């Protein structure tokens, strides 16, 4: 993903056909090491293709993928209820710890 992001950044910046060296330079400028195999595969697959056209095709493909609907909503509500109960239990435990922390000694006594 990082290789593709650097490639697209170069393309949007005006470089119509970024090379592996260009992508590697972008990645190293932010402290990321480039994976040679993945980078070479990406460059070979995208060579000669228009970035704007690729983005448009990808958007069409994403729009055609079903999103799942309301099936996951009921599971999320149950998980949220469990998280609230855990938070209450943690608060009670934290209160105990706070009372034990002082142990009768003040910081500035």
UniProtKB/Swiss-Prot annotation:
<feature type="compositionally biased region" description="Acidic residues">
    <location>
        <begin position="91"/>
        <end position="103"/>
    </location>
</feature>
<comment type="similarity">
    <text>Belongs to the eukaryotic ribosomal protein P1/P2 family.</text>
</comment>
<dbReference type="InterPro" id="IPR027534">
    <property type="entry name" value="Ribosomal_P1/P2"/>
</dbReference>
<feature type="compositionally biased region" description="Gly residues">
    <location>
        <begin position="68"/>
        <end position="79"/>
    </location>
</feature>
<dbReference type="GO" id="GO:0022625">
    <property type="term" value="C:cytosolic large ribosomal subunit"/>
</dbReference>
<dbReference type="GO" id="GO:0003735">
    <property type="term" value="F:structural constituent of ribosome"/>
</dbReference>
<dbReference type="Pfam" id="PF00428">
    <property type="entry name" value="Ribosomal_60s"/>
</dbReference>
<keyword id="KW-0689">Ribosomal protein</keyword>
<dbReference type="GO" id="GO:0002182">
    <property type="term" value="P:cytoplasmic translational elongation"/>
</dbReference>
<comment type="subunit">
    <text>P1 and P2 exist as dimers at the large ribosomal subunit.</text>
</comment>
<feature type="region of interest" description="Disordered">
    <location>
        <begin position="63"/>
        <end position="109"/>
    </location>
</feature>
<dbReference type="InterPro" id="IPR044076">
    <property type="entry name" value="Ribosomal_P2"/>
</dbReference>
<keyword id="KW-0020">Allergen</keyword>
<feature type="modified residue" description="Phosphoserine">
    <location>
        <position position="99"/>
    </location>
</feature>
<keyword id="KW-0687">Ribonucleoprotein</keyword>
<protein>
    <recommendedName>
        <fullName>Large ribosomal subunit protein P2</fullName>
    </recommendedName>
</protein>
<comment type="function">
    <text>Plays an important role in the elongation step of protein synthesis.</text>
</comment>
<dbReference type="InterPro" id="IPR038716">
    <property type="entry name" value="P1/P2_N_sf"/>
</dbReference>
<keyword id="KW-0597">Phosphoprotein</keyword>
